[in-house]
């Protein structure tokens, strides 16, 4: 673990980060639909969008010819992710709509016991599956009778997210309060004809419990923090990304005890805009391009992550991994999400903030869908 002097030497030569996100970026109004005159509005929004009218999108091919209704239906991909992290445990839950199949996974890693509970499910053609079409108000439901029931609920007033999971050996009920949080809300062009919209939030405390194999863990008592990823759009048929996310209380320095959240990615936002950002006490600060260095053949080795010309420098030490690997003709995916601990700093308006000890995730994803 590097000491404060080492961190200071690393960052002393870099410029300050910009002012808070809402002061430096021109925002589009979130209270208007995403699709206007058949085209998506591209850029940053001042809030998560309540109207994602995908059906109004005109999905032409590169030669200006309209694609069929089936191609339009098949081309739209959606996924939602809810994560929780603390010094006691780390958990993640993802639900994805690939049209011809719906996929869900849940894992819980007990840091104290160093044990991983993990399971994934697939539902052909999305049977027993409903997906909220925005992250402000709605419900996502993945259910296989007598096997698993996952319920993700978005509520606008008061602004909060709730996740309930019931399956053999695992019972989760968790709520993340997002009042006072500025989400990252952005839409970018993807490929020639497509687009990707995402709303992300991190760094908010969690309430509720995780019951794993009859052990009941109160999330407020262990100071668990959460993250939410809502993504939809017309993404590339073959694509990839790396992603990092963290949330929790700062553990050292002048900001000790304050709330922090982090979202970093590469390979997702192709042009003009970046979803990379840092949250401090609910306030969102922009970050530019991020770089991920890791051993692609052994992703459990340490990762190095930098952003904003080095104003953010992190090392991530994985504790374990959830993996999905499918080679099935039309669908090919190699997904690896590592969970573990970050070390490093960010320089924010000239102030060095230590992020040592924060828990979170990194991800390496290849998919052809």
Please provide the spans of the model-predicted regions.
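Structured soluble/peripheral alpha/beta segments that form catalytic or ligand/cofactor-binding pockets
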Residues: 20-369
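N-terminal amphipathic/basic-hydrophobic helices that include classical n-h-c signal peptides
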Residues: 1-22
